[in-house]
Amino acid sequence: MATERRFLNQAKEKTMPVETRRIALLNGVDVIRLTGTIEAVKADPQVACFKFRIQNRWSGCGQNRSQVQQFSAGGRETQHKTNLTLEADEPDVLLGTDKGANPVEHLLHALASCVTTSMVYHAAARGIAIEEVESSLEGDLDLRGFLGLAPSVRKGYQQ
């Protein structure tokens, strides 16, 4: 946590305890911390380097459970405030038990979340208020690629 503060509370905010630091929220984003992060990255590009990782365990049929705990931020190991768990399964038509989103649905969620968060943070950095963001994503799959039945058919999403 202290390591994380080093990267996110640069400049004049660096010496202020988090509890007494002013917070200016725009789109739910702490703009003071965001500005400090931007300045820290400008001053030291190494601060921008992150490595995220998960530990996955197959639990039968199409079910998987991944644990998210630690990551590297600016070359230093840090961890989430709590251990996070991601569950995946396949729908019945793909021989699963349908107890969770399947891996390709998780990919769509990750893409939508990444694009939306990026847009909201960039807007906040520019002083633009956003009232609402909604998106719909879809992807086409052809099981012949996954099953190895047609070498010309791409495995995974088609585009």
Please identify what each model-predicted range represents.
Residues 111-115:
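Alpha-helical metal-binding/catalytic segments enriched in His/Glu/Asp
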